[in-house]
Amino acid sequence: MAKEKFERSKPHVNVGTIGHVDHGKTTLTAAITKVMAEKNGGMARKFDEIDSAPEEKARGITINTSHVEYESPNRHYAHVDCPGHADYVKNMITGAAQMDGAILVCSAADGPMPQTREHILLSRQVGVPKIVVFLNKCDMVDDEELLELVEMEVRELLDQYEFPGDDTPVIMGSALRAIEGDEAYVEKIVELVQAMDDYIPAPERDTEKPFILPIEDVFSISGRGTVVTGRIERGVVNVGDEVEVVGIRPTQKTTVTGVEMFRKLLDRGEAGDNVGILVRGLKRDDVERGQVLCKPGSIKPHTKFEAEVYVLSKEEGGRHTPFFKGYRPQFYFRTTDITGAVELPEGVEMVMPGDNVKMTITLINPIAMDEGLRFAIREGGRTVGAGVVAKIIE
């Protein structure tokens, strides 16, 4: 049979399984692919295929991640599953696998465990918009009241981290029994995917978001003016648009007088395009790498923020020794390094290679930033950590 062609007609949504080790994340992933393949076409994937996750590199960090895909009646899902807890931490902090929503897997037999909490916290810190819950291994619990108790605990945990516990869909089932073909449990997988369809919002397309282009280079072309180059991160820019240059120095306004790509003049550029943009009235020295060109008022420069950070282990090429408060590395945002000072949370004296930690960072120059922006931590050009802006302070 010929390969089915990739259907572009359905909206594409990125999800992932999160939760404590051995609560059944990978088994659930296998169950969803099997049930959806039977109902809507596509490939069923076995536990072993998913579990032997290939290594990937994201921002110089090695992460083991498995990618599967499946179709619901309304959507095409790309789904990530990680074998180890450390892989989740790295994956979520680096944004290697962007998640529009997460499926929290919690064993009904064990209830919430430390990593259940930690993955919910990470989801909050890195800006995962919605979580749906699958209470797994319900076939091992005879007591209705016990199931209700675990459900209540999970909802309370979600509330603690500012997810709407009461409104979150909670599906009770057994991934293993669904794989074995037990009809009652297959139905629960269908219910779960239906809950994802209903509860996880389809992501806004990159082209619909406000325009932003991280500036990589600046040239001056005699007789034409100043050109900034870079890859449009999101949004669309048209010739004639007013834009701002934000970051490092005071914000400046200008107008786009030309957009070129591969030496051809265009009327517009959009997310993903590598372009040169001609800007009116700015000199070559007014603009520098590390600033962004953006829709006026859409993004502000900031210097102080709270971040969730993963520190590379020695084996990953990171530091060999811990760092302490007052640590001053470079923070690499988009296209440039900015020096900053680190404050650690109360009671944390030092951070070891391989740890993840919440910290407050103060940069010496402002950078255009939103919550959710990813960055690398570097020492002399070598990556020693990865982070994400969790909360802007000033």
Swiss-Prot record:
GO biological process per UniProt: adhesion of symbiont to host cell
Region (G5): 174-176
Alphabetized UniProt keyword annotations: Cytoplasm, Elongation factor, GTP-binding, Hydrolase, Magnesium, Metal-binding, Nucleotide-binding, Protein biosynthesis
Residues that hold GTP according to the record: 19-26, 81-85, 136-139
Gene Ontology cellular component list: cytosol
A Gene Ontology molecular function term of the record: GTPase activity
One Pfam family, short name: GTP_EFTU
Annotated segments matching region G4: 136-139
Segments of this protein annotated with the region G1: 19-26
Catalytic activity reported: GTP + H2O = GDP + phosphate + H(+)
Keyword flag ATP-binding: no
EC number: 3.6.5.3
Localization per record: Cytoplasm
Domain tr-type G intervals: 10-204
Annotated CDD domains: EF_Tu, EFTU_II, EFTU_III
Record region (G2): 60-64
Main localization (coarse): cytoplasm
Binding site for Mg(2+): T26
Span list, region G3: 81-84
Record's subunit section: Monomer.
Described function: GTP hydrolase that promotes the GTP-dependent binding of aminoacyl-tRNA to the A-site of ribosomes during protein biosynthesis.
Family recorded in the similarity comment: Belongs to the TRAFAC class translation factor GTPase superfamily. Classic translation factor GTPase family. EF-Tu/EF-1A subfamily.
Protein name as it appears in the record: Elongation factor Tu
Species whose genome carries this gene: Francisella tularensis subsp. holarctica (strain LVS)
Gene that produces this protein: tuf
